[in-house]
Design a protein with these regions (language model features):
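Conserved NAD(P)H cofactor-binding loop of Rossmann-fold oxidoreductase domains
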Residues: 90-95, 233
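Catalytic loop of short-chain dehydrogenase/reductase
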Residues: 133-169, 181-182
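C-terminal substrate-recognition "lid" of short-chain dehydrogenase/reductases
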Residues: 128, 206-230, 235
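Conserved glycine-rich Rossmann-like NAD(P)H-binding loop of the short-chain dehydrogenase/reductase
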Residues: 30-44
Length: 237
């Protein structure tokens, strides 16, 4: 793979899906910048696991709700690991609110973390001379009555994906993965069994079904501005 020995930044990669993506990239020889906000203990444990793959890796703390923190994150990664060739925008809020109890501060926070931070990171990475890939993780369902600001911000990320794909071509390809219900790590209790029978595939997704899509995006230099739903077909119902 052409990205062996290159550097990847995965936001929100201390645990859950972000961790699994970081572990996958490390397993195929890609250096990993492990980002976290508050989950320092999880980040330490994940970094320990990642380093078993004998690649360069380090952990970086940043609250992505502020521009200066996004810029400092990239500065620290560049100084520690070097320039970034792969950016996976995984960090996200997931706040419950509806039209009636949503405040402007909620909109500002969710839009900054979910939309503006990916924009800032993408723009700054593009200022270098490298070629690379950006993958935005979103949700199969962005119109959500009870996660109002989350859904709005994820809907906007789809527009960002296409706008960046045009603006950053041909050096970078920017694509999107819209996730449905995914099996949690084996050490995390699940209360999502009711979702298993939703959708044509009648089950939740697996982590390897996400990482195989990421591999495809990394390998292919002619796909950009595309969204792939990994949701067992729920988006077509």
């Amino acid at each position: 793979m052409k990205f062996i020995g290159k550097n990847a930044l995965i936001t929100g990669s201390a645990n859950r899906i972000g961790k699994d993506i970081a572990m996958y990239l490390a397993s195929i020889g890609i250096n990993v910048a492990l980002h976290y906000n508050k989950s320092s203990e999880s980040a330490i444990n994940t970094l320990r696991e990642i380093k078993k793959h004998k690649i360069n890796s380090n952990m970086f703390q940043a609250d992505l709700s502020k521009e200066k923190n996004c810029l400092n994150l990239l500065k620290n990664v560049n100084q520690t690991l070097g320039p970034i060739s792969i950016l996976i925008n995984n960090a996200s809020t997931f706040k419950m609110n509806n039209l009636h109890d949503t405040k402007v501060v909620d909109l500002n926070n969710d839009f900054f973390v979910n939309l503006i931070a990916p924009f800032i990171l993408s723009r700054e990475i593009f200022k270098g001379n490298l070629k690379g890939k950006i993958i935005n993780l979103t949700d199969w369902k962005t119109i959500r009555k009870n996660r109002f600001t989350y859904g709005l911000s994820k809907f906007a990320v789809s527009g960002l994906t296409k706008s960046l794909a045009i603006s950053m071509a041909p050096r970078f390809q920017i694509n999107e993965i819209a996730l449905g219900a995914i099996l949690p790590p084996v050490d995390v209790p699940t209360r999502r069994s009711k979702k298993i029978n939703l959708g044509p595939m009648k089950r939740v997704g697996r982590i390897d079904e996400i990482t195989s899509c990421i591999k495809m995006f990394l390998d292919n230099d002619f796909i950009t501005g595309e969204k792939i739903n990994i949701d067992g077909g729920r988006h077509i119902l």
